[in-house]
Regions:
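Hydrophobic N-terminal alpha-helices or hydrophobic patches in metabolic proteins across all domains
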Residues: 1-174
Length: 174
């Protein structure tokens, strides 16, 4: 038996992203997390980005698609869609929300998911789009092929989370 230590692939650079119909997603955060985790760009290890400040709970599995990059091309697409010229890419991999009816208890995992749509978002004048996907073979969500087919409340919950999770209660939204 070979018990030697094997190197862990960097989740952003060292893992195949899959195909447009079935992506691999590296999950950083699950709905029960009270801390926002993020992959350290240099080491590839999951690290604490910040404690969740308020009672917002991420409404799905959340992470990124390996080997993607929200930079110049994403900024161009966002500028075109919003009729703007000043949006930049955020320099991170493309974010993904993976819907599942199962309770996944921790992040730092890879899942296979079917993209069904997305949300175009800005964060401090940077493109911060979110791909919305469903977990492969999920008993409830795998029947959905388009974000427009989802129950409206699920889409509203996603939009609400991403438009309010950085807000400070009692202060005007920036």
């Amino acid at each position: 038996m070979d018990y030697s230590i094997k190197c862990k692939s960097h989740p952003w650079h060292g893992i195949n992203p899959g195909t447009p119909d079935e992506v691999r997603a590296f999950i950083e955060i699950v709905p029960t997390d009270t801390v926002k985790y993020e992959v350290d760009k240099e080491s590839g290890y999951l690290s604490v980005d910040r404690p969740q400040k308020f009672s917002n709970i991420v409404p799905s599995l959340y992470g990124f698609i390996p080997r993607t990059w929200c930079n110049v091309k994403m900024a161009e697409l966002t500028n075109k869609a919003l009729a703007r010229l000043d949006v930049e890419g955020d320099g991170d991999p493309l974010d993904i929300c993976v819907l599942t009816e199962k309770d996944v208890t921790h992040g730092d995992i890879l899942v296979r998911a079917k993209p069904i749509g997305g949300l175009r978002l800005l964060d401090n004048n940077q493109a911060d789009d979110k791909i919305i996907a469903v977990l492969k073979n999920d008993a409830i969500y795998s029947k959905y092929d388009d974000i427009e087919d989802l129950p409206v409340q699920i889409v509203r919950r996603l939009i609400h989370y991403f438009t309010t999770y950085k807000d400070i209660p009692g202060e005007t939204n920036q």
